[in-house]
Structures are given as C-alpha cells and as structure tokens.
Amino acid sequence: TKSMPTVFNFENVKTVPYNKNEYYVLYEAASGYSTLTWSSGNQGFALTGSGYTPNDFPTSISPNGRTGNCLQLITRKTGSLGTLVGMPIAAGNLFIGSFDIGSAMSDALSATKFGTTFYYEPIKLVGYYKYKAGPEFYENGESTNRKDVFNIYALFYEKTKDVQMLDGHIAKNNYEHENMVAAAVITDTHETSEW
C-alpha cells in the first residue's frame, strides 16, 4: 500500500460516541493507498457537556460543499467546564496527526500532534473554501472589537530521533522549526460566500 492519499474530498465520515456525545471523524480512503483518518479537537470538546450531536461540534461536515460534502469549522463556546479551566471557546480544526486527550485540559497546543509519513515532494496545495467571521471575537473569555481570521497550512518536516512530531505550538512560532523542510500558508484570508 502506498503512502497517504494526496486528494481529499471529505466524503467519508463515521460517527464516534464519546462521553454521552457523538461526533464525526473524517477519513480518506482511496484505492491503493493507506486510509488516512483526520484528527480534530472534537474529543476535547466532548468533555464540555453531554447530548451533543455531530453538528454541535466545532469540526463537522456540511452537504453544501462545492461538490458533495465539505468540512465545516465553527468556533463554539465550551460552557462552564471550559471557562473553569481557562478555555472558554473551542475552534474547529482538522489536521493530519493525532489529538492527545490526556493533555487537552492542561496544554491544548501540546495535545495537537501534527504529522504522518509522506513520500512525495510537495509542489503545491490547492483547495476551495468559504469563510465568514463570527459575530464576536473572544480573547481570554471576553468579547473584543477584533475580527476573527482563519488559517490553512501544510507543514513538511524531517522526523528525527528527537523530533517525532510537531505540535500546536508551531503556529505561535510563526510556522518555523529547525526540522521544517517546507511550509504552505494561506496569505489571503478574506471573507467570501463563494467557493
């Protein structure tokens, strides 16, 4: 079986029960490739309440894609538990790697582990999106006058004995790390209602 697929459609989804909730896990299955299971912080959001349906989560799908389904990322309030631990909101996210639920409450950025082995030389990242900023921007649990922006990026790095995976701190470090080989970061993050 080859490496992971290089075309992603967000058409394959399974529902996962956790903490009296159900959320979506997306995966890519293409003939001749290993199945790629996407990761998100949905498992962490599931700790904030019960009775959530998959579409209540920050990371879900919508049937209103350019063709077929699309990924839907929404920032959600985390309720009293999230406020208690200093994490009053949860942003929708999707990444290749894993989410360490054991670290989620104490260090959310470390809980996000990016990466999988990729055997090709990357040339470009192409995709489609729609984006609308939420009506309020929260910082430290308080509404501010700032406006939200989104981010899309692909990071390629060399795995070594000391660095097996990069984590969520990479964004705070301006997407720079000594093991980085290449990065593609979207620069035009304007709101648009068209694909």
Language model: regions and residue ranges:
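Aromatic (Trp/Tyr/Phe) and Gly/Pro-enriched flexible surface segments
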Residues: 2-124, 147-157, 164-195
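Extended, low-complexity, turn-rich repeat/linker tracts enriched in Gly/Pro/Ser/Thr and Asp/Glu
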Residues: 131-147, 160-163
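A short beta-strand element within beta-rich, extracytoplasmic domains
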Residues: 121-133
